Design a protein with these regions (language model features):
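Extracellular/periplasmic catalytic domains that process cell-envelope and extracellular macromolecules
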Residues: 32-35, 73, 138-140
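Hydrophobic/aromatic beta-strand patches that form the interior of the parallel beta-sheet core
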Residues: 1, 22, 79-81, 145
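Membrane-associated lipid acylation/remodeling enzymes share a hydrophobic transmembrane-juxtamembrane segment
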Residues: 38-133
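Alpha-helical membrane-anchoring segments
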Residues: 1-6, 11-13, 17, 171-190
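Catalytic core of membrane glycerolipid acyltransferases/transacylases, capturing the structured
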Residues: 1-35, 45-63
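Structural element of the ATP-grasp superfamily
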Residues: 16, 70-71, 147
Length: 190
């Protein structure tokens, strides 16, 4: 779970922890994997959750490669999950985060006390038209999720995880595989 949740919504974060969520930190993910726990990672994080609705058919990790390094270090396969409909539960019209970050660099404070990571303008419940990463109730739409076959890589270990070119190749493989599966899922349900 995004570490900002613990600062902004500590009550929600505590409830999520009761059902097994952990803070999105590599140290905690490594501990979980070494206990042979399944670890569900959202590489795109809050930017993926609040990306504009017109990007819903795209796999967006925003260059985040930590999940690849983690898998390589811990000799773990990546089991992709993709879904159709999740971005219809909230209609994000635009993300004003880049403009907000620019204003922050000029000295203006964040409107949310901390760096929000995303600042969407969206239509959703219960607010109607809302601005900012606020908690919301999902719109009632059908969701279709597919758990894809595991992806393994030819090389694992510290050396593989520290080779930027190899990490990029693994990242590209995962992203492309997930995009192909997402395209198939959209074709099946639209």
């Amino acid at each position: 779970m995004d570490p900002r949740m613990w600062q902004v919504f500590p009550g929600v974060a505590r409830m999520a922890a009761w059902v097994g969520c952990i803070r999105a930190e590599s140290r905690l993910a490594i501990q979980a994997l070494r206990r042979e726990a399944a670890v569900l990672v959202y590489p795109g994080g809050i930017r993926d959750v609040f990306r504009p609705h017109h990007q819903r058919r795209q796999v967006c990790f925003f260059g985040q490669r930590g999940f690849i390094k983690l898998a390589l270090l811990e000799h773990a396969p990546i089991v992709p999950m993709i879904s159709h409909g999740a971005h219809d539960t909230l209609q994000v019209l635009a993300d004003f985060y880049p403009a907000l970050a620019g204003l922050h660099r000029w000295g203006l404070p964040w409107p949310t006390v901390i760096d929000p990571g995303a600042f969407p303008l969206y239509l959703g419940l219960p607010w109607g038209l809302a601005l900012g990463p606020l908690p919301n109730l999902p719109l009632p739409v059908p969701l279709h999720t597919r758990v894809c076959p595991p992806i393994t890589f030819p090389h694992y270990g510290r050396e593989a995880a520290h080779d930027p070119n190899y990490v990029k190749d693994c990242y590209d493989q995962v992203r492309q595989t997930m995009q192909q599966e997402l395209d198939r899922l959209y074709a099946a349900y639209e």
